[in-house]
């Protein structure tokens, strides 16, 4: 694997949209006891369900620590799931894994962003994070993909959504947060995005979902469903803390054009809940200094927007909530050519994210 001194844009590469053909999806096995309750066992069962759901549509590779390899291999024993040993600090491969980029000549490379556990020592969720910092490079090494490294620039994959046609959507709450890249201006951050994603237009939503401990990742709030169309988490309850956030995002989207000059079509997705962890669920998490505390009084950032597009399928979370059926119907309407598969998302949510956060698609090579 070669680390390149250029940028994807300069070399004719771009980040494709999530609906582009994929070769596989990456996951990382959860085990961190100060984040996942009961030593991670319920979350591991949820990951098995998720991996098997994806494997119906395309191959899955699950990275796992040496200590958990035998356990994971036993539970994931089926033909379309590969288990590989990679040391890690936690399971959030959307944020720690590489952002894959492609060109028109059948090549796939990867961007290795800086990672500081969502804020480093200024609001970050755990320390140390050095094994997570190395994960993207190891994935690219395994896949024989050349690597672009953004030294000194922190970004998580969950903080961006692209349409593959020149536009990226993100949030000010995350990318302009002082605990990510305080040495860079908004314009400088946009320049990095343009160079490494090969986009021309950056759409800045003010905030993400209320109480999202990643500082408002866009993938839990608003996502592309096709060029010019997005799905936005929504509530009509003016007493909900998300009300102002949803309406502010809608104002931006309604008054913005994408890189192709299109107005946005915005589909609304109801927000489940409000959802909270139980005292029993919180008690199952080890309390460790420097790690995110779990508290039953703190609202969980549950969202149906946190789904994954795979080849021919939509893998989405359910929450045993009255809005589950409506969420399924909305996804089926928006993606008529995909099979919508909903799996229980509560155990994933208890750890601080959901399906999209815990997966990373690898696009297929394209020759034009």
Swiss-Prot record:
<keyword id="KW-0378">Hydrolase</keyword>
<keyword id="KW-0620">Polyamine biosynthesis</keyword>
<comment type="pathway">
    <text>Amine and polyamine biosynthesis; putrescine biosynthesis via agmatine pathway; N-carbamoylputrescine from agmatine: step 1/1.</text>
</comment>
<comment type="function">
    <text>Mediates the hydrolysis of agmatine into N-carbamoylputrescine in the arginine decarboxylase (ADC) pathway of putrescine biosynthesis, a basic polyamine.</text>
</comment>
<dbReference type="GO" id="GO:0033388">
    <property type="term" value="P:putrescine biosynthetic process from arginine"/>
</dbReference>
<protein>
    <recommendedName>
        <fullName>Agmatine deiminase</fullName>
        <ecNumber>3.5.3.12</ecNumber>
    </recommendedName>
</protein>
<comment type="similarity">
    <text>Belongs to the agmatine deiminase family.</text>
</comment>
<dbReference type="GO" id="GO:0047632">
    <property type="term" value="F:agmatine deiminase activity"/>
</dbReference>
<dbReference type="InterPro" id="IPR007466">
    <property type="entry name" value="Peptidyl-Arg-deiminase_porph"/>
</dbReference>
<feature type="active site" description="Amidino-cysteine intermediate">
    <location>
        <position position="357"/>
    </location>
</feature>
<dbReference type="GO" id="GO:0004668">
    <property type="term" value="F:protein-arginine deiminase activity"/>
</dbReference>
<comment type="subunit">
    <text>Homodimer.</text>
</comment>
<dbReference type="InterPro" id="IPR017754">
    <property type="entry name" value="Agmatine_deiminase"/>
</dbReference>
<dbReference type="Pfam" id="PF04371">
    <property type="entry name" value="PAD_porph"/>
</dbReference>
